[in-house]
């Protein structure tokens, strides 16, 4: 699933080609996503100029002069730029054609993504309860410490809770906990303030590094410019269960936590 760095990489790839451009038409080939694409999307968006392309958590917000297109890439979706008129392959559900001659094409083989319309996106039901962005001053270790008090759940699903902080998905939660030396199975309430301060620093560092390297390409992800991400080359533990720790050589362990595969080093993490 594309996580925050992959979505931010997509935003950075498409924004320069969308902002300031006028939409000539919208082609919807299949409306059957996680939520159906609105029947009137073409009417609402065609003829409008795109003002700004933003990201909130893992949602892309394509702001027009009036209204906003909210897009989520789901499990395996992507948005990329193609030339208007390029034949569409299977699973290429939507084209947003621009007067520049480019089109923003939405592909989603598993159809778990979304393309919705809102006149008040930040108060949309999918966004209104989201926690702070991890790369802003609204998120820090003190927030993690305070919210963890009384929480008996494991620390990994705790930091993956979008009400606590957005965008810390399975890949980056796994890597941040390793970097901070914290066992992902530990109860959230049992971790000290000092260790949460360290964890928040590592979350920020790892997410920023992943964005800089274009995200992590494990299966389907490509950025808005059609290029893969390269952060997978720097993964220490994610997807490496049973292999040796790159730091100490101990065998990495793996188990399910909150329905997600979790990998950790029993020596480096406690």
UniProtKB/Swiss-Prot annotation:
An MF annotation (GO) of this entry: zinc ion binding
Active site (record annotation): 2 (schiff-base intermediate with dna), 3 (proton donor), 58 (proton donor), 260 (proton donor)
Zinc finger (FPG-type) residue numbers: 236-270
InterPro entries linked to this entry: DNA_glyclase/AP_lyase_DNA-bd, DNA_glyclase_Znf_dom_DNA_BS, Formamido-pyr_DNA_Glyclase, FPG_cat, MutM-like_N-ter, Ribosomal_uS13-like_H2TH, Znf_DNA_glyclase/AP_lyase, Znf_FPG/IleRS
Entry's Gene Ontology BP terms: base-excision repair
Record keywords: DNA damage, DNA repair, DNA-binding, Glycosidase, Hydrolase, Lyase, Metal-binding, Multifunctional enzyme, Zinc, Zinc-finger
Enzyme Commission number(s): 3.2.2.23, 4.2.99.18
Binding residues for DNA: 91, 110, 151
Keyword DNA-binding appears in the UniProt entry: yes
Cofactor note: Binds 1 zinc ion per subunit.
Cofactor(s) required for function per UniProt: Zn(2+)
Protein origin, superkingdom: Bacteria
Record has Metal-binding as a keyword: yes
Subunit structure: Monomer.
Family statement: Belongs to the FPG family.
Protein purpose: Involved in base excision repair of DNA damaged by oxidation or by mutagenic agents. Acts as a DNA glycosylase that recognizes and removes damaged bases. Has a preference for oxidized purines, such as 7,8-dihydro-8-oxoguanine (8-oxoG). Has AP (apurinic/apyrimidinic) lyase activity and introduces nicks in the DNA strand. Cleaves the DNA backbone by beta-delta elimination to generate a single-strand break at the site of the removed base with both 3'- and 5'-phosphates.
Name listed for the protein in its UniProt record: Formamidopyrimidine-DNA glycosylase
Organism: Pseudomonas fluorescens (strain Pf0-1)
């Amino acid at each position: 699933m594309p996580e925050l760095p992959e979505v931010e990489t997509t935003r950075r790839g498409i924004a320069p080609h969308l902002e300031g451009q006028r939409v000539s038409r919208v082609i919807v080939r299949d409306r059957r996503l996680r939520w159906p694409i609105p029947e009137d999307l073409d009417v609402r968006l065609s003829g409008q100029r795109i003002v700004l392309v933003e990201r909130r958590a893992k949602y892309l917000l394509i702001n027009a002069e009036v209204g906003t297109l909210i897009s989520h890439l789901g499990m395996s979706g992507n948005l990329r730029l193609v030339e208007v008129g390029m034949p569409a392959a299977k699973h290429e559900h939507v084209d947003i054609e621009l007067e520049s001659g480019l089109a923003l094409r939405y592909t989603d083989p598993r159809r778990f993504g979304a393309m919705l319309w809102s006149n008040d996106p930040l108060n949309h039901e999918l966004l209104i309860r989201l926690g702070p962005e991890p790369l802003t001053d609204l998120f820090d270790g003190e927030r993690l410490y305070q919210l963890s008090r009384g929480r008996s759940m494991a620390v990994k699903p705790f930091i993956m809770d979008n009400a606590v902080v957005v965008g810390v998905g399975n890949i980056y939660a796994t890597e941040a906990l390793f970097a901070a030396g914290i066992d992902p199975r530990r109860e959230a309430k049992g971790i000290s303030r000092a260790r949460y301060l360290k964890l928040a620093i590592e979350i920020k560092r790892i997410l920023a590094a992943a964005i800089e390297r274009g995200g992590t390409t494990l299966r389907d992800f490509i950025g808005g410019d059609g290029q893969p991400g390269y952060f997978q080359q720097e993964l220490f533990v994610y997807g490496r269960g049973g292999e040796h720790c790159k730091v100490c050589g101990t065998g990495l362990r793996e188990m399910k936590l909150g329905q997600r595969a979790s990998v950790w080093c029993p020596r480096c993490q406690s």
